[in-house]
Amino acid sequence: MSESQNRPKSPLARRFRGFLPVVVDVETAGFNSKTDALLEVSAVIISMEDDGMLYPEPPVSFNVEPFAGANIEQAALEFTGIDPFNPLRDAKPEADALNELFRPIRKSVKSNGCNRAILVGHNATFDHSFLFAAAERGDVKRNPFHPFSTFDTATLAALAYGHTVLSRACQLAGIPFDNKEAHSAEYDAMKTAELFCSIVNRWKELGGWTTDQQDYAD
């Protein structure tokens, strides 16, 4: 049995069946995770107050160097406004960025008595595919994320607020959203984290989750 499995589960671990929710957003130079460059990555660990309400931790974010031979679609750069080769980006190689990104996530998984992190994203399959493709390319070890399961805030927002677009869902949830700041991995990750916490907390307030149900997660 692993050390994390021996550690008593925190209320957060019990809330999500041993999974630690971590919001991830990426900015890329295209849609193909195998061929197109990863340019930015940001992660926001989700924590829980004593009363069971969720809140986002500060983001951990990196600009990323395009990997050797990466495809870069000009249309994608025009959409995000990112110049991949601007030296002021202080970009890191993929493997270095992911190793640093994963370190605090593994620490939080351990401290909460969780088994794994689970990626939370807005259209999460996209972010998950780029994160895992980059980890595979860089031979990054000890990836803390579940290899295929995710929590998708586009789906959750459609249920809770009747809208799937991040900016509109945030507005409906009462979360300020600046379209001029959008398409930055860090900004979008923070707003996705706020949206996720808003939906889960609202569900709790409506009686959809109580502390009595925590035993079901064991």
UniProtKB/Swiss-Prot annotation:
Keywords attached to this entry: Exonuclease, Hydrolase, Magnesium, Metal-binding, Nuclease, tRNA processing
SUPFAM superfamilies per the UniProt record, alphabetical: Ribonuclease H-like (SSF53098)
Name a GO CC annotation attached to this entry. Answer: cytosol
- Catalytic activity, EC: 3.1.13.-
Cofactor note, please?
A: Binds two Mg(2+) per subunit. The active form of the enzyme binds two Mg(2+) ions in its active site. The first Mg(2+) forms only one salt bridge with the protein.
Molecular-function GO term, any one: RNA exonuclease activity, producing 5'-phosphomonoesters
Q: Where are the transmembrane segments?
A: none
* Residues holding Mg(2+) 2: D25, E27, H183, D188
Residues annotated as the enzyme's active site = H183
Tell me the Gene Ontology biological-process terms attached to this UniProt entry: DNA replication proofreading; tRNA processing
**Gene3D superfamilies xref list:** Ribonuclease H-like superfamily/Ribonuclease H (3.30.420.10)
Q: Which positions carry the signal peptide feature in this UniProt record?
A: none
Q: Spell out the residues of the site Important for substrate binding and specificity.
A: F31, F79, F126, F148
Please list the cofactors this protein needs.
Mg(2+)
- Residues forming the Exonuclease domain are 22-196
Binding residues for Mg(2+) 1: D25
Job description of the protein? Trims short 3' overhangs of a variety of RNA species, leaving a one or two nucleotide 3' overhang. Responsible for the end-turnover of tRNA: specifically removes the terminal AMP residue from uncharged tRNA (tRNA-C-C-A). Also appears to be involved in tRNA biosynthesis.
Which family does this protein fall into? Belongs to the RNase T family.
- What does the record note on quaternary structure? Homodimer.
Extract the HAMAP family matched here.
Answer: RNase_T
The name of this protein is Ribonuclease T
User: Which organism is this entry from?
Assistant: Hahella chejuensis (strain KCTC 2396)
Provide the taxonomic classification.
Answer: Bacteria, Pseudomonadati, Pseudomonadota, Gammaproteobacteria, Oceanospirillales
Q: Which gene encodes it?
A: rnt
